[in-house]
């Protein structure tokens, strides 16, 4: 079970975008995530008339390592660590380690 999932609101802990908040757009693999509005780079795109693509400079988000982000805790209004526990009915759920509140209600 992944501690950071698509759609989660996260805070960047390290790098040029430290302190910025954004939603996770997708997980690239087990170790990297793409966060909305974070780690934006300019890519030079060659025109491709077969696909109808116009060339130029495109700004897009690039993946960052999952260790450089933390889940945003709305109750505490800060980044927080996440743990995983098994409930009585056998379901695995994520919880915030600072206050024990469940992430997945």
Curated annotation (Swiss-Prot):
This is Large ribosomal subunit protein uL24. GO terms for molecular function: rRNA binding; structural constituent of ribosome. One of two assembly initiator proteins, it binds directly to the 5'-end of the 23S rRNA, where it nucleates assembly of the 50S subunit. It comes from the Bacteria. Coiled coil: none annotated. One of its GO terms (cellular component) is ribonucleoprotein complex. Belongs to the universal ribosomal protein uL24 family. InterPro entries: KOW, Rib_uL2_dom2, Ribosomal_uL24, Ribosomal_uL24_CS, Ribosomal_uL24_KOW, Translation_prot_SH3-like_sf. GO terms for biological process: translation. Keywords: Ribonucleoprotein, Ribosomal protein, RNA-binding, rRNA-binding. The keyword Cell membrane does not apply. SUPFAM superfamilies: Translation proteins SH3-like domain. PANTHER family: MITOCHONDRIAL RIBOSOMAL PROTEIN L24 (PTHR12903). PROSITE patterns: RIBOSOMAL_L24 (PS01108). Part of the 50S ribosomal subunit. The lineage of its organism: Bacteria, Pseudomonadati, Pseudomonadota, Betaproteobacteria, Rhodocyclales. Pfam families: KOW, ribosomal_L24.
């Amino acid at each position: 079970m992944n501690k950071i999932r698509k759609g989660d609101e996260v805070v960047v802990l390290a790098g040029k975008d430290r302190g910025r908040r954004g939603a996770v757009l997708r997980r690239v693999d087990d170790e990297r995530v793409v966060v909305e509005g974070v780690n934006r780079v300019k890519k030079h795109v060659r025109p491709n008339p077969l696909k109808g693509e116009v060339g130029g400079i495109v700004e897009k988000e690039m993946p960052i390592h999952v260790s450089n982000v933390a889940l945003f805790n709305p109750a505490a209004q800060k980044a927080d660590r996440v743990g995983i526990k098994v409930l009585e009915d056998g379901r695995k759920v994520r919880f915030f380690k600072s206050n024990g509140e469940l992430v997945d209600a």
